[in-house]
Amino acid sequence: MRFYNRYNSSLKNYLLCSINSFNTNTLKIPLKPTLSAVFNTFRGERSLKFIKLYLMILYISNQKPFIKKVKFSYIKKKILKRFFISVSLNKKNSFNFFMYMLNFYNYFFHIYYQKCLKYNRFENSLILYIDNIQFFFKNYNKQNQKTQIKCQLNLRNSQASILFKYLNNMFLIKVKN
């Protein structure tokens, strides 16, 4: 339990370090971000610690997410195997969201298999993917702990390229295969 508390506080401190620098809306883009993730749980996991951790990270970044969908997948109706969560983010704090993404990316950079942020573009939306995040806990299991976080940003046609340039300065981005 002590490890879990230390992990939470270090993550909180890291994400809070310069959260206000994106409060000014320099791009003038009314973003409508939707964030979704699929988490594989630990072997034998029966609680929903990851939902709490995931939402805590969003609250720290001042997003106050609205949960759209939570879906669970069980093994033999008892052991939680994975869950899917989808949230709508606060439009007023859209640039806090970019700071959240940047800090989250930097924090977990050393445990990525692909050290980049992947993206796809569909009509008026830009979809970003962070793949293969590994979380460090006591019973860390490398094979069971891969996850993907997907962020969808709905934009007007002309704004997708501006946003892409902006994000490209923050992350190493490549097209998802």
UniProtKB/Swiss-Prot annotation:
Keyword annotations for this protein, in alphabetical order, are: Mitochondrion, Ribonucleoprotein, Ribosomal protein
Q: Does the keyword Mitochondrion apply?
A: yes
Question: What is a single cellular component term in the Gene Ontology annotation?
Answer: mitochondrion
Localization of this protein: Mitochondrion
Keyword Transferase carried by entry: no
Family, similarity comment: Belongs to the universal ribosomal protein uL5 family.
Q: What is this protein called?
A: Large ribosomal subunit protein uL5m
| The organism of origin for this protein | Acanthamoeba castellanii
